[in-house]
Amino acid sequence: MLFHGEYTAYIKSGGRVQEAVGKNRRMERSSMKRKFLAMTLALAMGLSLAACGGGTASTPAPAETGEVEATTPAETGSTGDVITVGFAQVGHESDWRTASTKSAQDVFSAENGYDLAFVDCDNDSAAQLEAVRNFIQQGVDYIIIDPIVSTGWDAVLTECEDAGIPVIVIDRTIDDSDKYVSWVGSDFKVEGLACGEWLKAYAADKGITEINALVIEGSVGASATIGRTDGFKEIADREGWTILDSQSGDFTEAGGQEVMESYCQSYAGQFNVVICQNDNEAAGAMTAMDNAGVTYGVGGDVILVSFDANKPYVQMVMDGKINANFECNPMAAPTVAEIIQQLEAGETPEKEIYVSESWFVAEDNVSTITVNGEEQECIYVTQEVLDARPY
């Protein structure tokens, strides 16, 4: 168990760990970059002098850039003390994603001895692969990937491996687990199981004997979508619940509203549970149900459940608009920084590290649930609980 301020990371070992790349190897790459820069400057000066002797030199046109913009890491100093980190982020589709990005920018700051090259891939998997390859060309010391999809990574991870750049995966997972150093994130299936176990206990307490659920899934192919779907479906199948429909809202508010509007038309009066796989989808679903005259939350006709538990949506739990919200902790960056420091010291980090998470509920009738044989607390949201939320 590792402690990172307010956050606890649960560790699970397994798989082949890529060879640790420490300070000496990083300094070798830094030295190579400095030599290359010196050669480039020398050549540029020579060309400049030749141009001055032979007439006027034309101003070169700026190089064309792709659609993906990134902050470029500065050259490391002569001591190689600054650690350059490339971060290929999924995008900016949700409040959770914004919190994840801010965490990385805060942790990998100049004040902390880092130079962060950040790329918002805007949910474009091809752009994400390009971003990682650009990081390799830039010669960063470490690469962080929050993968848009879990497949198609073998070639680019092999390129990272060949370049001697350790890769750390956060949040979502990828299939090529032998080609990255560590993964830091959530157990998405456990989140789905917890949702199902809470709903089972809540329905029993309220005397609800029939569950007819609608699910608004996240992005197709994302490990968060797969895990939450599989976990909830496992409980639904066991309990004999009906899942009327399940469609992707792409983890966005607009997507959640669009899917829920369709549901309100197709299943009017037939559903009593809506499961949204993130907070932004829940916001869209609430708008659609408001427009359709469907009541939800505490005292409503529909039990509304969300995932992520960003602070504004935990507020909605306290207000009774959302019945339960299952946290997905976006603060992976402190744990990633610890992994980097382990690699710098020549140590081998754990392969899988799970961040701690909590389950938030609007009523105090279900205080605990059992998930995979482990009793877990359901936190009744009060103002004190809300004030303590860091994001």
What are these regions (language model features)?
Residues 84-111, 116-134, 140, 146-150, ...:
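Extracytoplasmic "Venus flytrap"
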Residues 96-110, 114, 191-198, 223-241, ...:
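Short, solvent-exposed amphipathic alpha-helices that sit
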Residues 78, 85, 128, 184-211, ...:
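Hydrophobic alpha-helical segments within soluble ligand-binding/sensing domains
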Residues 1-84, 110, 158-165, 375-378, ...:
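Short, low-complexity disordered leader/linker segments with a strong preference
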Residues 118-120, 175-201, 246, 319-330:
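Short beta-strand elements at the ligand-binding edges of bilobed clamshell
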Residues 70, 74, 81-83, 216-220, ...:
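Hinge/cleft segment of the Venus flytrap/periplasmic-binding protein
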Residues 137, 141-162, 232, 245, ...:
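Hydrophobic alpha-helical
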Residues 151-190, 212, 310-318:
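Flexible loop/hinge segments that line or gate small-molecule binding clefts
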